[in-house]
UniProtKB/Swiss-Prot annotation:
Membrane topology of the entry: Multi-pass membrane protein
InterPro entries: Membr_insert_YidC, Membr_insert_YidC_N, YidC/ALB3/OXA1/COX18, YidC/Oxa/ALB_C, YidC_ALB_C, YidC_periplasmic_sf
Transmembrane segments: 6-26, 350-370, 420-440, 458-478, 499-519
Top-rank lineage group of the source organism: Bacteria
The protein's name in its UniProt record: Membrane protein insertase YidC
A GO CC term attached to the entry: plasma membrane
Pfam families: 60KD_IMP (PF02096), YidC_periplas (PF14849)
GO biological process: protein insertion into membrane; protein transport
UniProt subunit comment: Interacts with the Sec translocase complex via SecD. Specifically interacts with transmembrane segments of nascent integral membrane proteins during membrane integration.
Alphabetized GO MF terms: membrane insertase activity
Localization terms from the record: Cell inner membrane
Gene designation: yidC
Length: 548
């Protein structure tokens, strides 16, 4: 085996990964949603089986902090819109990214309230509560670190229910506190609930990457329990009415998309019911309902939960709830992507540029892997030295494949050569490459992160395709510098066009990933020269053997 055959192996692994990812996307198509209506009454009404009644019409109030711009409906106190001022919708745009939305085209809401036998959100007790508020707009003032939005409702029996949203400066975690004052003569049985509901199919203006394999990340529901740290739940599974229904102490429920997440984290000592539901009208939901608590006559009961609505910032999410940081979609190689990101973030704290951080981490990774790379080239050099003996053996034994195989194994053993020695380092490099791919696609810190010159977003493709072309050029030079024993005409043709094929593939890949591959190729060129010089001294390499 030689380095050009190794390139072929990399290509096959790479193409196999792309085919697998495309197959995963095709075999789990998102169901086609029916037309959604502008109001949310019909969709939410279908959730009555889960104890979440229809919203109906209420007054919309505005709640703004330095990082959140929320719209809350006084009917039920649901968050119907969430804008993130710190995250532009698009590069160089003045419009903030919208996470939650209630429109004729798309519904994504964070619902919450009090249900149970005596809860005002129980459908059996009538329409959802219409809360009273002191004003229509709440703004976190300069110098203020906390903003409270109290909403009150008094039922026909005189019981008072207060729902207070508590927001803090620079924080995407919103505390939702409930106070229940029992003015009656019987205990009140109350449960809290939190539900996220979303249109299953994205409208055209939001569907920015479902047809592009390079932008494929998970969009759907997820949950966490003490037994299951992180479990995804696909929208199409909910649409097929294969619903979640489990009990858990602690944990959370969430809806995820690339870079952003919404999650409900219940805070109580009892058991919560985690569920998913097909609400009809093309809308899926995931939520929790707490174990009922009793509020005695003349007493006040307190309950609370937390809503995360914002970017997937791992350290902040981990501080809000255990394992909430796992919502960052690093795919099946998360155990490699997470430490890579921590290292990348540490480097960024010194250099202040994500592009230069990628360059530095590339040198670190390739430096750590240098012993394997050296072993790979040494093994390939020994294999090349054995080629004349192997060729003579083939001519001597003719078509006796069994004898050829036996004598080749004996030859490898006698010469202390591992025929797979050139492949093993590749099997290590490929997962690292794919883990970096997932890291770049899943880390919100790299979203719209500039590098230099024309690269203004490392998570997006190069708009002028300069980096992919440079990558192809470096790959071409590696090929030219590598010795080869490939004699099969078909393999020779494949190897000739391999830089072109890879260049085409990388046209749509994130600039940060292409940058990593360019730097990695440059390191390979340097390491090749150093290793070949050492092999020449040992008589295992000759520059005359290079392919011209």
């Amino acid at each position: 085996m030689d380095s050009q055959r190794n390139l072929l192996v990399i290509a096959l692994l790479f193409v196999s990964f792309m085919i697998w990812q495309a197959w995963e996307q095709d075999k789990n198509p998102q169901p086609q949603a029916q037309q959604t209506t502008q109001t949310t009454t019909t969709a939410a009404g279908s959730a009555a089986d889960q104890g979440v009644p229809a919203s109906g019409q209420g007054k919309l109030i505005s709640v703004k902090t330095d990082v959140l711009d929320l719209t809350i409906n006084t009917r039920g106190g649901d968050v119907e819109q969430a804008l993130l001022p710190a995250y532009p919708k698009e590069l160089n745009s003045t419009q903030p990214f919208q996470l939650l939305e209630t429109s004729s085209q798309f519904i994504y809401q964070a619902q919450s309230g009090l249900t149970g036998r005596d809860g005002p959100d129980n459908p059996a007790n009538g329409p959802r509560p219409l809360y009273n508020v002191e004003k229509d707009a709440y703004v976190l003032a300069e110098g203020q670190n906390e903003l409270q939005v109290p909403m009150t409702y008094t039922d026909a029996a005189g019981n008072t229910f207060t729902k207070t949203f508590v927001l803090k400066r620079g924080d995407y975690a919103v505390n939702v506190n409930y106070n229940v004052q029992n003015a009656g003569e019987k205990p009140l049985e109350i449960s809290t609930f939190g539900q996220l509901k979303q249109s299953i199919t994205l409208p055209p203006h939001l569907d920015t990457g479902s047809s592009n394999f390079a932008l494929h990340t998970f969009r759907g529901a997820a949950y966490s329990t003490p037994d299951e740290k992180y479990e995804k739940y696909k929208f199409d599974t909910i649409a097929d009415n294969e619903n979640l229904n489990i009990s858990s102490k602690g944990g959370w429920v969430a809806m995820l998309q690339q870079y952003f997440a919404t999650a409900w984290i219940p805070h109580n000592d009892g058991t919560n019911n985690f569920y998913t539901a097909n609400l009809g009208n093309g809308i899926a939901a995931i939520g929790y309902k707490s174990q009922p608590v009793l509020v005695q006559p003349g007493q006040t009961g307190a309950m609370n939960s937390t809503l995360w609505v914002g970017p997937e910032i791992q350290d902040k999410m981990a501080a809000v709830a255990p394992h909430l940081d796992l919502t960052v979609d690093y795919g099946w190689l998360w155990f490699i992507s997470q430490p890579l990101f921590k290292l990348l973030k540490w480097i960024h704290s010194f250099v202040g540029n994500w592009g230069f951080s990628i360059i530095i981490i590339t040198f670190i990774v390739r430096g750590i892997m240098y012993p394997l790379t050296k072993a790979q080239y040494t093994s390939m050099a020994k294999m090349r030295m054995l080629q004349p003996k192997i060729q003579a053996m083939r001519e001597r034994l003719g078509d006796d494949k069994q004898r050829i195989s036996q004598e080749m194994m004996a030859l490898y053993k006698a010469e202390k050569v591992n025929p797979l020695g050139g492949c093993f380092p590749l099997l290590i490099q490929m997962p690292i490459f794919l883990a970096l791919y997932y890291m770049l696609m899943g880390s919100v810190e790299l979203r719209q992160a500039p590098f230099a010159l024309w690269i203004h977003d490392l998570s997006a493709q190069d708009p002028y395709y300069i980096l992919p072309i440079l990558m192809g050029v470096t790959m071409f030079f590696i090929q030219k510098m590598s010795p080869t024993t490939v004699t099969d005409p078909m393999q020779q043709k494949i190897m000739t066009f391999m830089p072109v094929i890879f260049t085409v593939f990388f046209l749509w890949f994130p600039s940060g990933l292409v940058l990593y591959y360019i730097v990695s190729n440059l390191v390979t060129i340097i390491q090749q020269q150093l290793i070949y010089r050492g092999l020449e001294k040992r008589g295992l390499h000759s520059r005359e053997k290079k392919k011209s």
